[in-house]
């Protein structure tokens, strides 16, 4: 599972875990460990002096198996927002076609959700850290307000930009047929329908879910990791409770969203056609050696 923040991935995992065949946990370090292990071997002169690629492939590929060695379920869903940008990498190790569930949501709703969460989690004496957004602003001597928060979230160092970029890269590389986009508002409106589509995508039999008394059984240490105590909290009843973004976002951010909506929310196009309109008119890498694109024209 990949996708965008504040787009229902935790809710989706909570629902999928009702199915006795499925384990869907919190964000995992699996991809990062696999990638860094790969890079460490490639850059190690002892390895380049006497390479053993088959053994290295076995070592890297075994990370998934060992990380989930405590899980006895036939279907395991790993969560990392970078999976969309690493499809060929993971397919080289799992030896089968990747299938990535991609939760998405209107970008203005994502931004307003994050701002709302920050405001209801004001810093308390004794907390290990302030929220991760304001922490970045403080470290970079940037004034803290809703506009700078949104600007950071939509910058290359922000989680919204990073997840959008990773997803876009996967689409641009031609892997959209391996992605199932799940819109947050569709999930809340008709959850069973969305779950049935996920089961069809995964090749699993449908499963009848319940949508009351929900609880995230795989809670992360949100206050230590993000400085936000309810980052991955799930409401007991499935319903949309968010406020209209126009009541929360600064006017400048609303204008920015409205003028870039079709570029930002590119998945609405990719659902129906394989070739999509790029995020910018002509996707130009920020760095010729890296695969990242500007989000705004």
Task: Give the location of each predicted region.
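Conserved phosphate-donor/acceptor-positioning beta-strand/loop module used by diverse small-molecule
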Residues: 79, 90-117
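PAPS-dependent sulfotransferases, especially Golgi type II membrane carbohydrate sulfotransferases
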Residues: 134-157, 164-181, 192-193, 197-297
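PAPS/PAP-binding and catalytic site of the sulfotransferase fold
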Residues: 8-22, 90-95, 115, 181-206, ...
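Glycine-rich phosphate-binding loop used to anchor ATP phosphates in small-molecule kinases
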Residues: 59, 63-89
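Short aromatic-enriched loop/helix-cap "lid" or pocket-rim segments at secondary-structure transitions
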Residues: 35-40, 90, 112-116, 122-123, ...
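PAPS-dependent sulfotransferase catalytic core
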Residues: 1-70, 221, 228, 297
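Short beta-strand segments
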Residues: 1-3, 76-79, 102-104, 181-183
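Conserved nucleotide-binding/hydrolysis micro-motifs of P-loop NTPases
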Residues: 29-30, 105-110, 187-188
């Amino acid at each position: 599972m990949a996708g965008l923040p504040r787009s229902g991935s935790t809710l989706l995992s909570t629902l999928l875990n009702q199915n006795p065949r499925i384990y869907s946990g919190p964000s995992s370090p699996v991809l990062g460990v696999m990638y860094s292990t790969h890079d460490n071997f490639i850059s190690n002169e002892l390895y380049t002096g006497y390479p053993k690629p088959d053994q290295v492939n076995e070592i890297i590929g075994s990370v998934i198996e060992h990380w989930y060695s405590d899980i006895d379920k036939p279907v395991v869903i790993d969560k990392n927002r970078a999976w969309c940008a690493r499809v060929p990498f993971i397919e080289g190790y799992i030896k089968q076609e990747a299938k990535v569930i991609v939760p998405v949501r209107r970008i203005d709703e994502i931004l307003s959700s994050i701002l709302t969460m920050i405001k209801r989690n004001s810093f308390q004496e004794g907390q290990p850290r302030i929220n991760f957004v304001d922490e970045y602003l403080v470290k970079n001597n940037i004034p803290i307000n809703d506009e700078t928060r949104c600007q950071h979230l939509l910058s290359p160092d922000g989680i919204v930009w990073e997840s959008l970029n990773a997803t876009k890269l996967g689409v641009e590389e031609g892997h959209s047929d391996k992605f199932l986009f799940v819109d947050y508002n569709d999930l809340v409106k008709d959850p069973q329908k969305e779950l049935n589509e996920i089961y069809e995508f995964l090749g699993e039999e449908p499963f009848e879910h319940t949508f009351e008394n929900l609880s995230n059984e795989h809670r992360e240490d949100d206050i230590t990791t993000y400085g936000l105590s309810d980052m991955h909290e799930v409401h007991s009843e499935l319903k949309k409770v968010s406020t209209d973004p126009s009541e929360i976002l600064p006017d400048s951010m609303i204008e920015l969203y409205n003028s870039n909506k079709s570029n930002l929310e590119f998945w609405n196009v990719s659902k129906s056609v394989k070739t999509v309109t790029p995020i910018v008119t002509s996707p130009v890498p920020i760095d010729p050696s890296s695969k990242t694109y500007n989000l705004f024209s």
